[in-house]
Regions:
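Extreme N-terminal starter segment of soluble prokaryotic enzymes
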Residues: 1-3
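Conserved mid-domain beta->alpha element of the FAD-binding
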Residues: 5-21, 133-134, 242-322, 326
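Conserved Rossmann-like nucleotide-cofactor binding loop
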Residues: 11, 36, 139
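Glycine-rich FAD pyrophosphate-binding loop
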Residues: 20-41
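C-terminal helical "tail/cap" subdomain of flavin- and related membrane-associated enzymes
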Residues: 21, 62, 67, 289-377
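Conserved N-terminal glycine-rich FAD pyrophosphate-binding loop of Rossmann-like flavoproteins
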Residues: 35-53
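Conserved N-terminal helical subregion
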Residues: 47-161, 365-377
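Conserved FAD-binding catalytic core of PHBH/FMO-like flavoproteins
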Residues: 105, 128-246, 250
Length: 377
């Protein structure tokens, strides 16, 4: 088949590699609007078991990724300077650019070279392709085509992705008060020298702060002041660090005619559960498997992809939306005592009950039970 992949992010690069690896006879072309090596953001994070699927289906790529990742075994909550450790909740992270470089190397190994600096306004140039894959992210050109019946709505909080040269020891959620209202930061190292630092605030605080009316540098200075004790003198670093509201993207149809969507072009998962990149890679693997199984019977392959992937994806996306709801009200949660705040945080996505937490995080649960005992006396 002749296949066009629109978008050279993790989903597009990985799908291109898998399709060509599985069937060298496929003609695979990847079109990316940005120049090579030009990417936004800083690091991406995965839960500690999130890449197990990759080890099962593609151990070679897994073995290339794992040594390049930063790993830790605990999560830390920092409520106004008081810290609580959630033991046993591990994560791993890698720089987004480094991830793209590894996936590009895999792609090159099967003889596919993406075409960079190729922005697209429509899909007319793909009239002779058997399959067109939209892996072109939030502002997908492919998704704009009729037939997908997509819906986009914005959550109320505002956030921005920054970086810093302070390498944090573990993934930490830091919650602080400002003269205008509450702020929180999701921060974690993705290399020995750099960390991602995502800052979030609610709509009321955003409006009171006047952040929409000041310069990028003024916003950075304000955030460096709010999180001064967390950053310990290290400045925030920008890379297309635009303040915005999180878009929830959902599509009634995953494919239409010979077009199909994957990754953020198809769905979004709130960054508070750290699954966006994982879901994109899983989409690529699921679509490639369906095509491998059905061969040139494209419609059957696309139907199988949607039928088998949709239930799995829906659970994670639903959990991310539940988590996002908690963050929409994080200022209210900050009024809780630290142990109750941590309990509320853990319950935010509705996926972990208390019995399971005793197994996953025994030290934290022992502390929580002792706290409950103390306040009942």
């Amino acid at each position: 088949m002749k296949i066009a992949i629109v978008g050279g992010g993790p989903a597009g690069l990985y799908l291109g590699y898998l399709l060509k690896r599985d069937h060298s006879g496929h003609s695979v072309d990847i079109f990316e609007q940005n120049p090579q090596g030009n990417t936004w953001g800083f690091g991406v994070v995965f839960s500690d078991r999130a890449l197990d699927f990759l080890n099962l289906d593609d151990p070679e790529t897994y073995q290339r990724l794992i040594p390049k990742m930063e790993h830790w075994v605990d999560l830390k909550l920092d409520l106004l300077g008081e810290q609580i450790i959630l033991d046993g909740i591990g994560f791993a992270s890698i720089g987004r650019l480094q991830l793209l470089e590894i996936l590009s190397e895999r792609l090159t190994s099967v003889g596919v070279t993406p075409e960079f600096s190729t922005p697209l306004k429509d899909l007319s140039c793909f009239h002779d392709y058997d399959l067109v894959v939209g892996a072109d992210g939030l502002n997908s050109v492919v998704r704009q085509q009729p037939g997908f019946h997509s819906e986009t709505r914005l959550l109320s909080n505002f956030f921005a992705w920054y970086g810093t040269k302070k390498p944090f020891d573990t993934l930490t959620q830091s919650f602080r008060k400002s003269p205008w209202g509450p702020f929180n930061a999701h921060h974690y190292r993705y290399s020995k020298e750099m960390s991602t630092f995502i800052i979030e605030t609610n709509l009321e605080t955003w409006e009171r702060s006047g952040f929409s009316k000041i310069t990028d540098q003024e916003r950075i200075k304000a955030c460096e002041t709010i999180f001064a004790d967390v950053l310990e003198g290290e400045p925030l670093v920008q890379n297309r660090s635009t303040w915005r509201q999180f878009p929830v993207i959902q599509c009634e149809n995953w494919f239409h005619e010979n077009m199909v969507l994957i990754g953020d072009a198809l769905h979004t998962a709130h960054f508070s559960i750290g699954s966006g990149t994982r879901l994109a890679l899983e989409d690529s693997l699921a679509l490639s498997k369906a095509i491998r199984f059905h061969g040139t019977d494209l419609q059957s392959a696309l139907k199988t992809f949607e039928k088998e992937r949709k239930p799995v994806l829906s659970k994670l996306v639903d959990a991310s939306l539940q988590s996002a709801k908690w963050y929409e009200n994080f200022g209210e949660h900050m009024n809780l005592p630290p142990w109750e705040f941590a309990e509320s945080y853990l319950a935010r996505a509705g996926r972990i009950d208390e019995e399971r937490m005793k197994t996953i995080s025994p030290k934290f649960m022992a502390g929580l039970l002792q706290y409950r005992k103390n306040i009942s006396i």
